[in-house]
């Protein structure tokens, strides 16, 4: 089992943990359809930034 050489201070521990926080997903509302989707992703209807970029039946 690993044993530490020197005790880490509370400050060092907290500075290490400062990057561990989770953030919520950034969601956007499509202007034309009103659908909610992830930022910089195509909506389920195939619309991105107000333009139809993917035909719904194309992937089938």
Curated annotation (Swiss-Prot):
Keywords carried by this UniProt record: Ribonucleoprotein, Ribosomal protein
Region of interest (Disordered), ranges: 1-60
UniProt xrefs under InterPro entries: Ribosomal_bL32, Ribosomal_bL32_bact, Ribosomal_zn-bd
Taxonomic superkingdom: Bacteria
Gene Ontology cellular component annotations, sorted alphabetically: large ribosomal subunit
GO terms (BP aspect): translation
Family: Belongs to the bacterial ribosomal protein bL32 family.
Molecular-function GO terms, alphabetical: structural constituent of ribosome
Coiled coil residues, start to end: none
UniProt name for this protein: Large ribosomal subunit protein bL32
Gene: rpmF
UniProt biased composition (Basic and acidic residues): 11-22
């Amino acid at each position: 089992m690993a044993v530490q050489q020197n005790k880490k201070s509370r400050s060092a521990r907290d500075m290490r943990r400062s990057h561990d926080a989770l953030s919520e997903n950034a969601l956007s509302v499509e202007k034309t359809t009103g659908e909610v989707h992830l930022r910089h992703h195509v909506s389920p209807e195939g619309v991105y930034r107000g333009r139809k970029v993917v035909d719904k039946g194309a992937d089938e």
